């Protein structure tokens, strides 16, 4: 059986239960030997007084158990220089990783997506199909109900309950401590 490396780009500010289930969907897939998460550094703010940083994201992913999973390789998106200054683009990093590593890995490579982002898969496949062992994973993660990182940030900033935004094995207080 050919094994698959799944590449997942995103901001994840903050990572919510939908992200958790999305990552676990690929981690628990027996055909997947590696899940590579590329995370952008741009903060997401609520007003002037509350922001979610990449450090918050990493602490939450660790709390969820994602970063400690042996299948997961996590990396911050590379800082790039553009006409408007420095920026990160985790989606560009996924393309760069596939270009740089497709001939070095025995694994097939796939883009990890939720059901709301399937258009990206077509572009990824089209770009790489002529020279790399890129596959489409037919079992794109289907979200049973949409959870919003924006609403999660707003609830955190307002001090409201965040139970609906986090996995069942995590306590609200653990997340709140990260932002204290």
Question: In which residue ranges do the predicted regions lie?
Answer:
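Nucleotidyltransferase catalytic core that binds NTPs
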Residues: 1-180
């Amino acid at each position: 059986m050919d094994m698959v490396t799944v590449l997942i780009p995103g901001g994840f500010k903050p990572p919510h239960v939908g992200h958790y289930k999305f990552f676990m969907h690929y981690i628990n897939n027996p055909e997947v030997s590696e899940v590579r998460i590329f995370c952008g550094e741009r903060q997401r703010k609520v007003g002037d007084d509350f922001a979610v940083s990449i450090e918050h994201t990493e602490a939450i992913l660790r709390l969820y158990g994602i970063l400690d999973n042996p299948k997961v390789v996590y990396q911050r998106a590379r800082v790039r220089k553009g006409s408007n200054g420095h920026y990160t683009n985790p989606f560009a990093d996924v393309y760069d990783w596939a270009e740089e590593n497709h001939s070095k890995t025995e694994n097939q490579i796939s883009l990890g997506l939720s059901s709301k982002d399937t258009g990206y898969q077509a572009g990824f496949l089209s770009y790489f199909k002529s020279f790399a062992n890129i596959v489409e994973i037919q079992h794109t993660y289907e979200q049973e109900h949409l959870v919003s990182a924006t609403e999660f940030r707003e609830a955190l900033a307002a001090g409201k309950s965040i139970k609906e935004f986090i996995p069942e094995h995590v306590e609200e207080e653990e997340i709140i401590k990260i932002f204290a």
